[in-house]
Structure formats: structure tokens, C-alpha cells
UniProtKB/Swiss-Prot annotation:
The name this protein goes by in its record: Arabinogalactan protein 22
Family: Belongs to the AG-peptide AGP family.
Pfam families: AGP
Function: Proteoglycan that seems to be implicated in diverse developmental roles such as differentiation, cell-cell recognition, embryogenesis and programmed cell death.
Residues with lipidation of kind GPI-anchor amidated serine: S38
UniProt source species: Arabidopsis thaliana
Gene giving rise to this polypeptide: AGP22
Length: 63
């Protein structure tokens, strides 16, 4: 049992150091990329929704 005590101490020290240093290393990450600007697809989708509502209204009033 005495032979297993030395590697377990090394493992314990390694785990403790890792737990302490891991959050420090992650806190220095680079800032996130800025949000992308509109590429036109949202505008196209908005126009498509408006046209669908107009078509629905026309269909409702014709019948």
C-alpha cells in the first residue's frame, strides 16, 4: 500500500493545480466575434411574409 501513496500524492497535487489554473486560463480567452450584419435574407423573408399575408387577405375577400 505504501507504494501507491507516492503516485496518489502526485495525482492529487496535479488535480489541485489543474482546478486552480483552469478557470484562470479560460478567463483570458479572446472576445467573441461581433454579430453579423444583415445579409439581405431577413429582408427577403420579411417581404415574403408580407406578400403571403396580402395573398391570404385577397383570397379571403374574394371568397
Amino acid at each position: 500500500m505504501a507504494s501507491l501513496k507516492f503516485p496518489l500524492e502526485i495525482l492529487a497535487v496535479f488535480v489541485i493545480i489543474s482546478v486552480i489554473l483552469l478557470p484562470i486560463a479560460q478567463s483570458h480567452s479572446s472576445s467573441p466575434a461581433p454579430a453579423p450584419t444583415s445579409d439581405g435574407t431577413s429582408i427577403d423573408q420579411g417581404i415574403a411574409y408580407v406578400l403571403m399575408m396580402v395573398a391570404l387577405a385577397l383570397t379571403y375577400f374574394i371568397h
